[in-house]
Amino acid sequence: MKKLINNPNDVVVEALLGVEAAHPDLQVDHANKIVYRGDAPKPGKVGIISGGGSGHEPLHGGFVGLGMLDAACAGEVFTSPVPDQMLAATKLVKDGYGQLRAAA
């Protein structure tokens, strides 16, 4: 299998740049490595946040969008997102209707 990786140390950052370029309806918080809906938070909707280790794309960030996740945290390669990332995602999609979070 051929892999298109410029530098292993930059793979997560470059993947997020690719998501941002390919999906204008999504936003990326580059400081926290979070992909989230551009229209978040949605009034009257429970926020749904997921996250997990990078390296299995399009898993988690690939499921952000209408009828799916509101935000996804990209951990480092094969590493779960850190609590600060999940907290930052919580603040991005918070609307007072509660949230569901799942991280792997």
What kind of region is each of these model predictions?
Residues 34-66, 73:
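Glycine-rich, flexible N-terminal cofactor/catalytic loop recognition
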Residues 1-47:
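N-terminal amphipathic/basic leader segments beginning at the initiator methionine
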